[in-house]
Design a protein with these regions (language model features):
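Conserved pre-motif I regulatory segment
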Residues: 1-28
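Conserved SF1/SF2 helicase motif Ia
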Residues: 20-33, 38-67, 144-145
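Conserved RecA-like ASCE P-loop NTPase motor core of nucleic-acid helicases/translocases
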Residues: 53-61, 245-252, 273
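Conserved helix-turn-beta segment of the N-terminal RecA-like "Helicase ATP-binding" lobe
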Residues: 62-86
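Conserved helicase ATPase core of P-loop NTP-dependent helicases/translocases
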Residues: 82-93, 257-261, 268-302
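Conserved helix/coil segment N-terminal to the catalytic DExD/H
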Residues: 87-117, 128
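Post-DEXD/H (motif II) to motif III coupling segment of the RecA-like Helicase ATP-binding lobe
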Residues: 125-195
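Conserved interdomain linker/interface between the two RecA-like ATPase lobes of SF2 helicase motors
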Residues: 173-250
Length: 303
């Protein structure tokens, strides 16, 4: 069952196409609004309405591939889906719905074949340059099916150093923004934000960017040091000692485990979730975090 704004998103998307718009739309949805549920509902409706439809769901990390595929199965247990990801050691071809990593399929248009709809999660990572991986794959798929349509999804429809992702040269032509953070907070779907200044500062000098984002291996090397991790954990303890739950977004798998170890050493009940965490264990950890049994939860590209 979709929330009202999730169904509104799908309705506005269909209206966009019904209006005869040219180009490709980008859906802007706040973090925590449930993009994966919307994608699952959209794919299910498309396949059930037009059974011959072939959909390719792209993203940049295997954790999101796995997460999106799981949400699809939760929403539609018998979904005809496959996964194409070198990191997950899966190369499924031929299912109506394929979840794939862009690095694994950027040169595989001939193998993928005819696709009607491409969905791109975290689409702000799509380069405005024609030679980028996403652009190359879409160009190749368009040669196979000139009627191909692309839908992007992101919470941040802009790129540092370039501007909005609809600014030329751009893959996306319009932004559909069906719901605001303020509405989600008002309806209690999101908690109100209370930000605090920190005394600890981190230098990212020397950390390079790729596609407008920091290169994960370099960022993790910069932040995952004993001194930095200890300082951050101690500051969290001092600033958030009265809060029931602490959620940490870390720079990589190793970083997430190291922060969790420091929290445990400080006497804080903690756990860590990464892409390789088995589903049953992940569900147990999240349930414990929601109940308050686990106070601190670290993760890398999962939550």
């Amino acid at each position: 069952m979709l929330r009202d704004y999730q169904q509104r998103t799908i309705d506005q998307l269909y209206q966009w196409f019904a209006d005869g718009r040219k180009g490709h739309p980008c859906i802007e949805l706040p973090t925590g609004s449930g993009k994966s549920h919307i994608v699952a509902a959209l794919c299910k409706e498309a396949i059930q309405t037009w059974p011959e439809t072939r959909i390719l769901m792209l993203t940049h990390v295997k954790e999101l591939i796995e997460q999106n595929a799981e949400k699809m199965r939760d929403h539609w247990p018998n979904a005809p889906l496959g996964i194409y990801s070198a990191g997950m050691r899966r190369r499924d071809i031929g299912e109506p719905i394929t979840f794939a990593g862009i690095q694994s399929v950027r040169n595989k248009a001939d193998q993928i074949g005819h696709v009607d709809l491409v969905l791109i999660d975290e689409c702000h990572l799509v380069s405005h340059k024609q030679e980028g991986g996403y652009r190359k794959l879409i160009d190749d798929l368009t040669l196979i099916n000139p009627a191909l349509r692309v839908i992007g999804l992101t919470a941040t429809p802009y790129r540092l150093g370039h501007g909005y992702i609809t600014d030329e040269p751009a893959l996306f032509s319009d932004i559909i923004a069906p719901v605001s953070i303020e509405e989600l907070i008002f309806k209690k779907h999101l908690a109100p934000l209370r930000s605090k200044l920190t005394a600890h500062h981190l230098s990212v000098d020397g950390v390079h960017k790729r596609g407008g984002e920091y290169i994960e291996s370099e960022l993790q090397a910069a932040v995952d040091t004993d001194d930095h991790n200890v300082s951050v954990v101690d500051e969290v303890i001092s600033l958030a000692g009265d809060r029931r739950s602490w959620l940490f977004f870390c720079a990589g798998v190793r970083h997430a485990h190291n922060v969790a170890d420091i929290l445990t050493a400080r006497g804080i009940t903690s756990a860590c979730i990464v892409g390789d965490t088995p589903k049953a264990e992940r569900e147990r950890i999240i349930a414990g975090f929601k109940s308050g049994e686990i106070r601190a939860l670290t993760n890398a590209n999962v939550l």
